């Protein structure tokens, strides 16, 4: 699965977001700073979502396995 980053130049620098991941957005003074901030935002969102899911399933009989979405892309 590939994610799409969108960057928009604004008067103070750049804003960036990920089309496929609501809530993954950021700001930076430069494009490179914005790219790095966006990578960090995505990592934090995924880590947080995993931790929340694990805590909700704590003690439950669940099956956890890797998922390769959309034909292995």
Outline where the language-model segments fall.
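Short, charged, surface-exposed hinge/linker loops at domain edges
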Residues: 1-3, 32, 36-73
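Short aromatic-glycine-(Arg/Gly/Cys) micro-motifs in beta-strand/loop hairpins
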Residues: 6-19
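Hydrophobic alpha-helix-in-membranes signature
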Residues: 19-21, 65
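A short, exposed loop/beta-hairpin motif centered on an aromatic-Gly-Thr core
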Residues: 22-31
């Amino acid at each position: 699965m590939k994610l799409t980053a969108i960057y928009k130049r604004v008067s103070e620098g750049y804003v960036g977001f990920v089309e496929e991941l609501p809530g993954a957005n950021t700001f930076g003074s430069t494009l490179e700073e914005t790219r790095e901030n966006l990578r960090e935002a995505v990592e934090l969102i995924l880590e947080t979502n995993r931790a929340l899911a694990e805590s909700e399933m704590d003690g439950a009989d669940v099956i956890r396995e890797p998922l390769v979405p959309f034909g292995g892309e």
